[in-house]
Amino acid sequence: MEAVKTLIDRYGLADPATQDIGVFTNPILQQLYDQLVADGSNSLADALRVGAAIEEIDILDLEERIAQTDKADIQLVYENLMTGSRNHLRAFTSTLGKQTGDIYQPQYLDPIAYEVIVTSPTETGSGGQGRGQRQGQ
């Protein structure tokens, strides 16, 4: 999230984050958050499904945002976030299968795009983008 904060500061944008966990300034995000927390609170399987759904939404949102900018620094941060979301999607769906025997069905992604992601190996990002956070390099 440090990289996002750096971009917010660099471009003089208002920071929409609050200090309170689970509190959003955007009412649409707040409603989505509240619904997903309620949906995921029933069982481990439901929590894992909600986690996977969140990652699907994030991937689609990031793809849209990448296409809307020509700024390389913003694209890099979005691409790194998308790498994380794909890895998280793999983890949630894999854990769902191992822990419950359930097979996750994509809720937002195209089924082919989903299958490409979950059958691909775990990805690595660009480290700390030159801020000394790359391990072993």
Per-segment meaning from a language model:
Residues 1-136:
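All-alpha RGS (Regulator of G-protein Signaling) helical domain and cognate RGS-like helical scaffolds
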